[in-house]
Amino acid sequence: MSTSTTYEKLPLQPLFDTIEELKPKFIERLQKAIAIPSVSSDESLRPKVVEMANFLVDELKTLGFTDIQLKELGTQPPPVQDANLQLPPIVLGRFGNDPAKKTVLVYGHYDVQPALKDDGWKTEPFTMHYDKEKEILYGRGSTDDKGPVVGWLNVIEAHNKLGWELPVNLVVCFEGMEESGSLGLDELVAKEAQNYFKKVDQVTISDNYWLGTTKPVLTYGLRGCNYYQIIIEGPGADLHSGIFGGIIAEPMTDLIKVMSTLVDGSGKILIPGVYDMVAPLTDKEDQLYDSIDFSVEELNAASGSQTSLHDNKKDILKHRWRFPSLSLHGIEGAFSGAGAKTVIPAKVVGKFSIRTVPDIESKKLDDLVFQHITSEFKKLNSPNKFKVELIHDGNYWVSDPFNDSFTAAAKATQDVWNVVPDFTREGGSIPITLTFEKELGVDVLLLPMGRGDDGAHSINEKLDVSNYINGCKTLGGYLHYYGKA
């Protein structure tokens, strides 16, 4: 496939040059953001999460945003150690309010995953390390998601310095609980849909990554996730296998038998009716996979093994993105420590999830899962008690990769990177994507900044300087092309 497509380029070089000129200041801004350990899962660090929100408010004020609000979400629900623990606020702000312009809402999160140097970091996780030889910025939150969040601020600063008018109205929505379940966000979006977000025409999220390390992508789909547990309970207490082994029905044996009927060794889901709900692959979609820059070797490198179930790129990507999968996650209540323990567990809970795709209906999937597991347990004729439950579910999301948003983002990407981006889907879930689409009734674009090897949630999280600075150019260029669409 050609590395370029023909389109009318906008005169954006002055903007790109200004972003390059401001590079030292932009790196300093990210350094300040990383220095605030805004770990949402650590109650003792909640003041730091709030400090990060206030940092963003100060930045927005300096840049000329208006109608800046800190939306308080109330007390955090259990389980918590502090019953009065307050949820971090959601930061809202506007830049421009011209009724003749389109309005773009950008979402990001300012909280991060926990990180300690003792975890294996080469440097202090909350002190940004700038490796000038490799041109890499290391630090917790560098790519997930403080880099993209301050990237939007950088775009505004570059326009201000140039004296350029922003081609759209911009609304920002930055939350502080994304890494801990986005508590309160869905309710706020629903509440503000006809208030603060009333005139929004489009939502852009930069909270995902390139598929690999060399080619930018635009993401138009995410799988959903239905998470289940199977509870099997027998004896009144854990028992000694030397005394009771062979003479009672063991819950663990029942559970293993039932869980073995869910998926086979090739990854095929064995629950009847699941694949009947999957939307057929169209020729147009199938062609999108041809040009995507990916290989079996990259999968092996990412997994640290040679255990792929598929031997070619297209099959790997289809099974990661557009076919459902079932994964067994663990067994609660069973012995899992080192050494040998001859206990018969009295109660075990098996955990598994199904990644969902179009056109799987969540409720119908639940019914199929419950029917299958109930049927398989009945075949055992076991005297043990049995129950299957849905723990949580989140729907899949798929957009039109040929709409105005994606077309504008593709042009901006080509301007900056001189290559047509890959159009990708992802195997994971970003639930807020669906919430914005449903509540606001507008298109959502996933426009990633970081690479596939950035190590979000891992040790030595990083963001390449080229991705950070070119990412800012891409975000800015996108606003111009979308404003003209």
Curated annotation (Swiss-Prot):
Gene Ontology BP term (one): proteolysis
UniProtKB keywords: Cytoplasm, Dipeptidase, Hydrolase, Manganese, Metal-binding, Metalloprotease, Phosphoprotein, Protease, Zinc
Cofactor(s) the protein requires to work: Zn(2+); Mn(2+)
Keyword Cell cycle attributed: no
Residues where Zn(2+) 1 binds: D144, E179, H457
Taxonomic superkingdom: Eukaryota
Role played: Catalytic component of the GSH degradosomal complex involved in the degradation of glutathione (GSH) and other peptides containing a gamma-glu-X bond. Also functions as a dipeptidase with high specificity for Cys-Gly and no activity toward tri- or tetrapeptides.
PANTHER family from the UniProt entry: BETA-ALA-HIS DIPEPTIDASE, CARNOSINE DIPEPTIDASE 2, ISOFORM A
Quaternary structure and interacting proteins, as annotated: Homodimer. Component of the GSH degradosomal complex.
Family the entry assigns: Belongs to the peptidase M20A family.
Name by which UniProt lists this protein: Cys-Gly metallodipeptidase DUG1
Native source organism of the sequence: Candida albicans (strain SC5314 / ATCC MYA-2876) (Yeast)
